[in-house]
Regions:
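Carbohydrate-active catalytic/glycan-binding domains of CAZyme proteins
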Residues: 1-322
């Protein structure tokens, strides 16, 4: 008998689960209508399934933050709650950028959330001539921002497209100055090099961070959002300079991909959390049927469900077995 509900939550893609210091789990994910952000609170992982869903923010009617509300993540940083998410504009729905919400009180379920606006890139006060001016971050299609702390520094990793015409989606990393502003220029972390990252679209997105046994692992999702969607992985030594691309090693093959025999299609956009008994869990989404049953763009199909996968470790590295 499975330990965790399967699926954990139906109709929720891009799931994110945060376990707070009080032992409670907070769940958020992309809402199928792409028009709101909801959170759930539960004392156990399985409790998330039937937990009350609270709408804490809705899209704007016009202007920015008015369409394609995607991939929210809830974080607790320096005593405050934040949600990072991506959204497009009302008249330019693909002008997607990362935005930040902050909770005004200690209870994210009942206290008010306010908008801090778009994530801010690093800007040198002396202008472009000064070394360190970032004129690239968040200037193009940008989404899937995640954040983590390591050795007293906070970092952000996100996906951003380059070459607007061709649309390659890369992963970038930078140190953060505040919860809504970068401290350093962006550093290219990962680009779609391999065939399995280039099916229909050239994509690296949905980064998730896991620390284990002296290493930092970053999983990410590759290719288009149908059954070709899969997970890749990067790793770095915990003592390395995380802003040096040479510190990172990339797997040449996907660490998780479609398995028709197990009815797993397009696994990806995961996060990591700690299970009820302290085990490492991967929370991810996938469909339970093939793309051939989908009419139109898989992105518009609501049947991506949140699932739980217990992470195993071999030779110090995470292994993802369905």
């Amino acid at each position: 008998m499975a330990k965790y509900n399967d699926p954990l939550v139906r109709g929720r893609a891009d799931p994110y689960v945060y376990k707070h210091t009080d032992g409670n789990y907070y769940f958020t994910a992309t809402y199928p209508a792409y028009d709101r952000i909801c959170i759930r609170k539960a004392a156990t992982i399985n409790g998330i399934t039937d937990a009350e869903e609270k709408v804490i923010w809705r899209k704007h009617e016009e202007g920015i933050m008015a369409s394609h509300v995607w991939a929210p993540e809830i974080h607790y940083i320096d005593g405050n709650w934040y949600i990072y998410f991506a959204a497009g504009e009302s008249k330019r729905i693909w002008e997607i950028r990362p935005y930040v919400l902050q909770c005004t009180g200690p209870d994210p379920m009942t206290d008010e959330w306010i908008e801090l606006g778009m994530m801010q890139a690093h800007r040198s006060p002396t202008g472009r001539r000064k070394t360190g001016y970032d004129s690239y971050s968040f200037t193009e299609f940008s989404l899937d921002a995640t954040t983590f702390e390591h050795k007293g520094k906070r970092y952000m990793i996100w996906a951003e497209k380059v070459h607007r015409r061709f649309g390659i989606s890369n992963l970038y990393i930078a140190e953060m100055e505040t919860p809504n502003k970068l401290k350093t220029v962006q550093v290219l972390l990962c680009t779609p090099d391999y065939d399995w990252e280039r099916i229909d679209f050239w994509v690296c997105e949905g980064p998730a961070v896991l620390k284990h046994d002296g290493k930092i692992f970053v999983t990410y999702s590759a290719s288009a959002t149908g059954q070709m969607y899969c997970m890749g992985m990067l790793s770095a030594d915990e003592n390395a300079d995380l802003l040096d691309p040479k510190s990172w090693t990339k797997k040449r093959y996907p660490v998780l991909k479609t398995d028709p025999e197990k009815k797993v299609f397009g696994p990806g956009h995961n996060c990591f959390t700690t299970g009820d008994d302290g085990e490492v869990l991967c929370i991810l989404h996938y469909r339970d049927y093939s793309d051939k049953y989908i009419s139109g763009d898989p992105l518009n199909n609501p049947d991506r469900h949140a699932h739980v996968l217990e992470v195993q470790f071999e030779n110090g590295e995470p292994v993802f077995r369905l």
